[in-house]
Amino acid sequence: MKGSAMYSTNAADPATAEEVPDPAGAGSDATAKDNNRLIIDSRFGSLAISQNSVLDFPNGLLGFGEFHSFGIADLSDPRYAQFKVLQCLEDHQLAFLVLPLDPNTGFIDRADLEAACNSLLVDIGDLVIMLVVTVRKTEQGASITANLRAPLMIDSKTHTGNQYVMRSERYPVRFQI
């Protein structure tokens, strides 16, 4: 699977989805180390991933169960500082745009968060939530949605994560942001 275009959502520039490179032709497997950081040429550009932002997803992500090692990186454009990149360290063509979510925002009910934490054996105080974001080109510009149904639940102490599918259907797969 290395080097294949596995994720087709063009999301490098949420404001103008047209400026996004085609994932099938973008990125390479170039990697370098720089002061405890991994530098990866990704479809989102050159990404710096520090060792303390490397995460293990023991079950992989939905549809990508064979990939377990990911890193969190910032986008190079400060206009999109609210977004992060979840970059696969095993296949540099595989990357997702994600949006950190404060557990206290109410987008996900506290009872549902507690149920997820109990299921995943994560202390709610150590929980980091990230939503997978999709950008679609529309006639009006870009449509940006986040997946509230299957958020990434990360244990900040152990640096392990799971994509947890919420039991309630009230959480949309495509929540407009």
Regions inferred by a protein language model and the residue ranges of each:
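A short glycine-leucine-enriched loop at secondary-structure breakpoints
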Residues: 120-122
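N-terminal acidic, proline/glycine-rich, low-complexity intrinsically disordered segments
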Residues: 1-18
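N-terminal domain-onset segments
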Residues: 13-30
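Acidic, glycine-rich flexible loop segments
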Residues: 117-118, 137
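Short beta-strand-centered segments at strand-helix junctions
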Residues: 108-116
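Long, compositionally biased stretches
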Residues: 25-105, 125-177
